């Protein structure tokens, strides 16, 4: 699956005819390229008691960049029936007392805060891929839709400017590609320029603001920025929010 190849660094060989490949399959392939280092760990390796009839496996992959860190969790259900399980922070190597923003990569769905533990459903013969990012006091990156690892390969740097209340960064992808960057903040913040060119939604779970920033790669690098303001302040009138 794209999830397994995306979270692992092993070589990938393709036997497809790229000229006849369905666009949807081609998009999946692009989400596992380029290849990234480090292997995921089996989070349930020493706790699994039924390896014959219960084919449910959990993998974790902590990712660290100079600009930030997050944890990926892939849950594979190879059973022919749906399964429900409990994700535990300790199992994933995370602090049980810390709140994390939780995002479902394949469903493109923000799942609110994760703290300590949470029950999840996994469809039959399927998998779910979650990204956990420690909650910050300012807007931050939630995910991207360009790579399974959601920032390790395609986000070169991210910077929050407290004085200017601006989140900015550099994205890298092949020229001609398109993608989306997902940002998140608590309800104390709002985008400063009437959401120009972006999609903005408010979570019903925790009132968090989720912003989808479209990126178009005319060459292999895009520099972007989004200006914010306190949610109780009047909006700014006119200025580009993304460069």
For each predicted feature, which ranges?
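Beta-strand elements of well-folded, non-transmembrane domains
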Residues: 171-175, 187, 228-232
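Solvent-exposed beta-strand/loop surfaces of large extracellular or lumenal domains
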Residues: 98-117, 191-215
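Active-site-proximal substrate-binding groove within the catalytic cores of carbohydrate-active enzymes
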Residues: 1-136
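Short edge beta-strand/loop segments characteristic of extracellular beta-sandwich folds
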Residues: 74-76, 168-172, 182-184
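C-terminal beta-strand-rich structural cap/linker in extracellular carbohydrate-active enzymes
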Residues: 112-154, 205-243
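Surface beta-strand/loop "capping" patches
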Residues: 46-70, 137-175
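A generic structural signal for beta-strand entry/edge sites
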Residues: 68-72, 82, 117-119, 162-168, ...
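Short beta-strand/loop motifs in extracellular/secreted proteins, especially
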Residues: 83-85, 98-100, 177-181, 188-192, ...
């Amino acid at each position: 699956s794209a999830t397994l190849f995306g979270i692992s660094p092993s070589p990938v060989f393709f036997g497809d005819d790229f000229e006849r490949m369905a666009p949807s399959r081609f998009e999946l392939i692009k989400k596992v390229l380029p290849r990234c280092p480090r292997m995921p760990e089996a989070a349930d390796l020493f706790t699994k008691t039924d390896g014959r009839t219960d084919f449910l496996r959990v993998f974790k992959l902590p990712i660290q960049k100079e600009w930030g860190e997050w944890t990926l969790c892939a849950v594979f259900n190879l059973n022919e029936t749906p399964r429900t399980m409990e994700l535990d922070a300790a199992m994933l190597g995370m602090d049980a007392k810390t709140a994390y923003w939780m995002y479902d990569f394949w469903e493109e769905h923000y799942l609110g805060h994760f703290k300590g533990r949470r029950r999840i459903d996994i469809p039959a013969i399927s998998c779910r891929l979650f990204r956990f990012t420690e909650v910050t006091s300012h807007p931050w990156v939630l995910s991207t839709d360009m790579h399974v690892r959601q920032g390790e390969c395609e986000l070169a740097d991210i910077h929050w400017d407290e004085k200017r209340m601006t989140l900015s960064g550099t994205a890298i992808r092949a020229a001609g590609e398109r993608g989306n960057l997902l940002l998140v903040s608590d309800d104390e913040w709002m985008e400063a320029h009437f959401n120009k060119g972006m999609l903005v939604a408010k979570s019903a779970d925790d009132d968090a603001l989720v912003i989808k920033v479209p990126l178009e790669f005319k060459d292999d690098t895009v520099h972007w920025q989004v200006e914010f303001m306190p949610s109780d302040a009047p909006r700014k009138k006119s200025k580009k929010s993304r460069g």
